Swiss-Prot record:
Pathway: Carbohydrate acid metabolism; D-glucarate degradation; 2,5-dioxopentanoate from D-glucarate: step 2/2. Keywords: Lyase. It comes from the Bacteria. Pfam families: DHDPS. Belongs to the DapA family. It comes from Xanthobacter autotrophicus (strain ATCC BAA-1158 / Py2). This is Probable 5-dehydro-4-deoxyglucarate dehydratase. Its EC number is 4.2.1.41. CDD domains: KDGDH. It catalyses: 5-dehydro-4-deoxy-D-glucarate + H(+) = 2,5-dioxopentanoate + CO2 + H2O. One of its GO terms (biological process) is D-glucarate catabolic process. NCBIfam families: KdgD, PRK03620.1. Transmembrane segments: none annotated. It is an enzyme of class 4 (lyase).
Amino acid sequence: MNPQDIKTALGSGLLSFPVTHFHADGRFNAESYKQHIEWLAGYDAPVLFAAGGTGEFFSLAPSEIPGIVSAAKEAAGKTAIVAGCGFGSVVGVEIAKAAEKAGADGLLLLPHYLIDAPQEGLYALVKQICDAVGIGVMVYNRDNSVLGVETLARLCDACPNLVGFKDGTGQIGLVRQITATMGDRLIYLGGMPTAELFAEAYLGAGFTTYSSAVFNFVPGLAVEFYRALRAGDRPTCERLLRDFFYPFMAIRNRRKGYAVAAIKAGVRLQGFAAGPVRAPLDDLTIEEEAMLDALIGTWKR
C-alpha cells in the first residue's frame, strides 16, 4: 500500500491495536492471534496496528515482529495492517525494513528507548526510519519522544512518506498548534490510554480519529461510541462513558501496566487464548478479572 493510500485508510474510521497473543510459555500464538484479528476485522476497522503498544511491542524481540505482521496480514482481509517500530536508529531501521518485507502497509514509530533527546536527534531518528522504507510512517508523540511544531514541519518537508501524527501527551495546546500548522499534510490520531475518555477534546483540536484499545474485546461497543461521537450524539456518548468507560478506567487504574493487561484480560474473557502479558507487566487478579467480566456483560460474543 502506498503512503497516500494508508493515510486515507488511517483517516477513514475507528482504529485499534490488537493485543499480541502468547502461549503459556511466552511464545507467540499465531493461530489464536489470527482468529482475534479476523473477528476484529469483521467490525470494519480500516486499519489495525500489529505489534503496537497494546500489542506489547516493548516486550517483543525484533525477530518476532515480522511473524506477527505476517499473521495479521493473513487474517485481516481488506483491513490494512500498520506495524510497530522503535527502540532506536539501528534497531528501528532493521524493524522497519523487516516489517515492510513481511507485508506491513505502514509503520507506527513508537518512542525510542530510555533516554531524553534533543529535537535535532529526534528529527534524525524519524528521517532515518522514513528513508529506510517506501511505506507510510506515523510518528507518536509520547513520554521521552515529543516532536515540536518546527521539527515536525521540517520532517513533513523532508519525508514524503511521513503521513501521520499520533499524540499520547495530552498537551492539547501543542497538538492544536500542530494541526493548525500542518493542516491536511498529516492524518491525526488520538492515542491517550482509553482514548474514548479524551476523544471529544481531540476531535475539537482538529484530530481525525483515534485508536480504541477496548475495541480488542468489545468492538461493537467501541463502534457505537465512535458513531455517536461523529454524529454529535452526546447523550449516547455520556451513557457509554458512565456505564462502561469510567468503570473500566477504575479497573485500569488499579495498577501500573493495566492499560495493556486489562485489555488482554478482556480478550481472554471473550474466549480467545490470548495468554498472559510478558514481564515487566503483570496480569489482573482473579477478582479484577471478575469485575471486568461483569462490566463486559451483554457485550459478550
